[in-house]
Amino acid sequence: MGATPDQEISYALSNACEVLNTVKKNGQVPKKDFPLVVGRISFFVNAGIKFITEMCKMRTMTSLWNDICTKKYKVKDEKLKRLRYGVQVNSLGLTEPQPENNVYRILLEMLSVVLSKDARARAIQLPAWNEALGLPRPWDQQWSIRLQQIIAYETDLLEYQDIFNGSKVVKNKVEKLKRIVKKELNIIEKMGGAVAAVENSYMKNNLVKSMSQRVSDIETGEQIVVGVNRFTETAESPLKNDKEGFIKVDSNSEKNQIRKLKIWKNKRNQSKCFKALKKLENAATRNENIMQASIECAHAGVTTGEWTDTLRKIYGEYRAPTGVGKSSKIEKNNNKKVNERINKLSSKLKRRVKLLVGKPGLDGHSSGAEQISVAAKDAGMEVVYEGIRLTPEQIVNTAIEESVHMIALSILSGSHLSLTKEIIKLLKKNKISNIPLVVGGFIPEEDEKKMIRLGVSRVYTPKNYDINLIMSDFANILEKHY
């Protein structure tokens, strides 16, 4: 989230090269079959609102991948050198204010990856217009699918060759992007490759910094977002309904899933499952290819949890760098008054104000939590952020171990009520319910009120895009409490 076009291309290509270099080095694939492995590499990219830039981004990536396949990996078959990629149209740019405008944003972002035939996406994943409000209903999802079908079947888009070939503007922009990307690829290669650039947080730090710049540009008005920081006047939308405009997560869904799993486990052949898991464990222990053993596990009826638990025992659990270890301060985004207030409160407390940022549940969207972490650091707080997919127990245990002054939860999965209830319950059980708790996410107004009644100090949604104001809010809550 937040990657610039050159970062997206260079990080994706360097990662692909890392995979192919490793496959080549381990010798499991015969030399004559290696081009087939190259041909199976596929990418998943983002499509943003900058229409021309995004189209040129994919033409650049297509050209560079062809060069890499030809020169680096000696692939001759043109079919195996194609850039195979799917697209997630940019959910980051969807807005809660005037959400009907998101329909146009989604259309434009889709066009940027389908108009240029030579760099056309092979698969497209469109968000729904109301994803900044909550989880989309089947009707909302259908609306997005219909957009793809109209483009494919009603327009003449698929009837022509690439209409951008011969454009000097496009050619110059692509050449400029190529130079920037090649420079970045060289930096990563000198570092030791993509794995090294992940392990030393080089990639993540840059991504968080780019996202911080984007947030700052929106706050200052340098980047215009219609309905958010410009043209905010609006008539009431007939599409927006706080009570029925999106799916609500059933509070019993977890219990129902556990019940189904128990039924499944009781019906399957336990002996067959045990043998399949043992075979998986042996393959992983010997550092062999685990694919065949994993397929056998699936056929035997092994659950995803059992599969991952088996591998976790051998490999451990990987926690990716968060990218918030260092301040990514953007000077124009610096709120000196908040900084002074936090310093004053830290002096009163005889130690630095400490904030815990938590991502509970299966929600993997981390950019909001990262931006809050960075802004809180810049405001003078000590920040504890351990990444995504944490359990309520892990978050509360960290709050106790770190003696934090405030907890900020980021929940975009739609499970904000159940997860918040569980965390508040655990805080009370551990006698630390006096710690202020704030929650951010795609939270309907009706649920905001419920969460405040539960004891949440403040709820933030996409309409609260000004991080300086959020930090000022944090200072208010902390000063009032301590």
Write out the residue ranges for each language-model feature.
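Flexible, glycine-rich loop/tail regions that form catalytic "lids" or insertion modules at the edges
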Residues: P138, S144-Q149, Y153-K337, I400, ...
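Glycine-rich phosphate/diphosphate-binding loops that line cofactor/substrate pockets in enzymes
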Residues: P35-V37, A284-E288, N339-V353, N397-S403
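Helix-rich catalytic cores of soluble enzyme domains
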Residues: M1-S112, L126-R146
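Short acidic/histidine-rich active-site segments
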Residues: K117-E131, L157-I163
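Short N-terminal or domain-adjacent regulatory/targeting segments
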Residues: C17-K25, R319-L349
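Short beta-strand/loop segments at the ligand-binding rim of alpha/beta enzyme cores
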Residues: R82-Y85, R351-K354, N430-V439
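Cofactor-cradling patches in redox/metallo enzymes
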Residues: A369-A379, V383-A475, E479
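Conserved, mostly hydrophobic/aromatic
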Residues: W65, S116, L147, G166, ...
